[in-house]
Amino acid sequence: MDNIKISNQKKSKRTSLLIFILFLALVISLGGLLGWTLYSLGFGISPRHKMVTYYAVCLGEFDTKAQAESFGQGLRLKGGAGFVTDDNKVLASVYTSKSQAENVVSNNPDYAGKVVTIEINAEYKNERKILNNLIDVCIDYVKNPDSADCIKSLDDIVKRADELDFVRAGFKSYLTRMVSVVKNMNSNLGYGLNYLCVSGADFLSV
């Protein structure tokens, strides 16, 4: 009987040890996975981004598209983007920083302005980089439309537009049109970046 008890005790200990080892392995695996996920998110290793957020300056909301277009045309003549949204808001400029957009609104008390958030689904880091480069180039274009560097940068952006998963036909078409305008030295700055309404760097300064 004593031998049977000792044998059973040994089996029980081995079973307990095996369960403990399996549990420990599971904890280490899950802990490693969680740690890597947090590390990736915290240190920017993960290539994925849910949204890219921009802050647009809205200078008017209208009941009809015709009213909005008329107001937008006036803004374009002054150097603003004058972009009309689907819900008849007229946007004058856009920034990557909310505080910049708020400063523009507060520095232009003649308009009933407000900041509108624009979120664009940029799944990967390279898309986010292209968007930010696009904004920088277009702001430079408004300041110096005959710059050779601006023309080259716009050409490069159009060529890389296919890299963006979220690109629509209208967006690429507008970029192509904008490059044509810049190359022809068209004086109408209203052709700025209409799709993302990046323009008006001189019209609305921070």
List PLM regions with ranges.
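Membrane interfacial helix-start segments of signal peptides and signal-anchor transmembrane helices
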Residues: 12-26
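Solvent-exposed beta-strand motifs enriched in subsets of small alpha/beta binding domains
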Residues: 21-23, 31-136
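N-terminal Lys/Arg-rich, disordered targeting/topogenic segments
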Residues: 1-14
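Charged/polar low-complexity intrinsically disordered segments, enriched in acidic residues
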Residues: 127-183
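Structured segments of extracytoplasmic/periplasmic soluble domains
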Residues: 71-78, 104-108, 157-160, 164, ...
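Compositionally biased amphipathic helical and low-complexity segments enriched in hydrophobic
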Residues: 7, 18-19, 135, 197
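C-terminal amphipathic alpha-helix
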Residues: 171-206
